[in-house]
Amino acid sequence: MTEGTQVFLLPISTSDSTKEPLSTVTSQAQDSSLSANRPVTEKQQEEAEWESISRLLVTRGFKPLCLVKGANLRDFIVFDKQSSQRMRQAFKTLMEETTRQQSMLQELIETNHQLKSELQLEQNRAAHQEQRANDLQQIMDSVKSKIGELEDESLNRVCQEQNRIKDLQKEYKTLQMKCQHYKKKQMEQEETIASLQKEIRRFAKEEEDRVITQKRLFTHLCRRVPHSVLDKQQCGEDDSQSEGKDYLNLGVSPTYKGLLTSLQKQLEKSNSKIDVLLGEKLNLQKDLENRPTEHELRLYKQQVKKLEKTLKKNIKLQDLIGQKKSDDMEKKDEPSKDIHQQALVDQRYFQVLCSIDSIVHSPRAPGVIYKQSKERAQNRSKDAVQECGFEHLVPVIEMWADELTSLKDLYKSLKILSAELIPWHNLKKPNENEGVKVGDLLLMVDTMLEEVENQKETSSMPNSQTLQAIVSHFQKLFDVQSLNGVYPRMNEVYARLGEMNNAVRNLQELLGLDSSSSLCMVVSTVGKLCKMINEDVSEQIKRVLGPEDLQSIINKLEEHEEFFPAFQAFTNDLLEILEIDDLDAIVPAVKKLKVLSY
């Protein structure tokens, strides 16, 4: 072997040495003998290099290499100088590669931790933003609920005000009716006063005529022929005096005085009689006003007859009950008790029928339209009438029941009429359990009359053609085919408008804007906020990725795409070599190999 060869001895097992041929052993012995002759400096240099490699192996966790001197060559493998150099270079490159890979792994772990921390920060920020959004949603829900409560309160107030207005309108109508009634009474009283004044004038005129006739009679008596000397003298004196003094001269005579006093007394009596007659007339008029009418008088007479009949029947029943009680005390038989109970029940029924009869014949009851046929009235006997007298209640109650059932038809017709006259009014539906009431019908009629009067008063009311054009315009505007869908769509539009106004008001409060700010200002402020949020997101992305421009981001991603496949292949090879399944188990496995190499 030449001098360029190098002897490198490694320990091997005896079983392997026996399997090798003898030629290799002899060649190794020759090489070892030749290597002893090489220069000392090269040998020391190589030993130093191997020691440095051994130190590198020790730092990496492997067992150190040992240089053996003067030992049996059976247990060693000998390499030449070139293979030893290549082995040293391979060891160095492997060590450098492992250090580079470890540094790369360390950088990847650090970047992974950094990304995890940034991800945690972003998650915390997202959770904070989500919590803030939830808080804002809760605030919005509470504001919506408060707005709903305020709307309900306003609706209740409006309903109360409408009910109050209706009550005031009803009171106004009643006051108007009372005023008209009092006006009618005033007119009647004025008419009576005028008639009384006419009668007074007539009486006064009659009195004046009577006084004139008395005067004429008196003058006639005074001008009659005198029968005595005194009368002749008096007549001569009267003739000699002037015509203007005849009345005074005649007053001196006692006959004239007596006639005058008698006439004055008669006049006073007649005046007193006139006053008495006027007072009696006024009292009679008051009595006539307070007295019932002919119809009420008939009803009262019928009620008196019915009450007399009921009184007789009650007396008879009380007599029967007294007899039954005496019989019960004497006999104490059970059939008599049953008869007594039956009599009590009959008395209760009779009282109920009497109360119904009194209601039927009361002035408040409606007029009875039903009339019994003459044949039934003739065939019915007088005894039956005296005994019962309640046969007329059945047709009356039937007639009232028919009238009450016809109220529903009347309500339907009035509803149709109101739909034609006032379609914009939503009339309340009567409760099915309570039925139709006359008050509801009167309210419907009053509302229709009010609307008709208002239409007559307001001459500026549009005609039917303009109203139809407005309705058709609303149908086109709201995309509704029928008239019934206009009101729901309008309510929906108003509801959406209210929601939009509430949302705008909430945005104004959240953004700190004035309530008088326009929608354009709100939109511009929201756009500014979105722009700020987008800028923050872009800055966060730049902070995470590092570079500022897009091309550098693309380059970095391409570098990552080039690096990760090689790193993945390297890690897969390591996993296969070390026979493990997890990346975290690579470092412990390498440490174990390092410990085993020692």
Curated annotation (Swiss-Prot):
User: Native species of this protein?
Assistant: Rattus norvegicus (Rat)
Superkingdom assignment: Eukaryota
Q: Give residue ranges of the TPR repeats.
A: 484-517
**Which of UniProt's keywords are assigned here?**
Coiled coil, Cytoplasm, Cytoskeleton, TPR repeat
Q: Where is this region: Disordered?
A: 16-43
Any one Gene Ontology biological process term?
Answer: cilium assembly
Q: How does it assemble?
A: Directly interacts with tubulin-gamma; this interaction determines centrosomal localization.
Q: Name one GO cellular component term.
A: microtubule organizing center
Gene for this chain: Cep70
Describe the task this protein carries out: Plays a role in the organization of both preexisting and nascent microtubules in interphase cells. During mitosis, required for the organization and orientation of the mitotic spindle.
Q: Does the keyword Transcription regulation apply?
A: no
Query: Polar residues compositional bias: what residue ranges?
Result: 16-38
Write the protein's name: Centrosomal protein of 70 kDa
| GO terms for MF | gamma-tubulin binding; identical protein binding
Known PANTHER family for this protein? CENTROSOMAL PROTEIN OF 70 KDA
User: What residue ranges carry the coiled-coil annotation?
Assistant: 99-210, 255-317
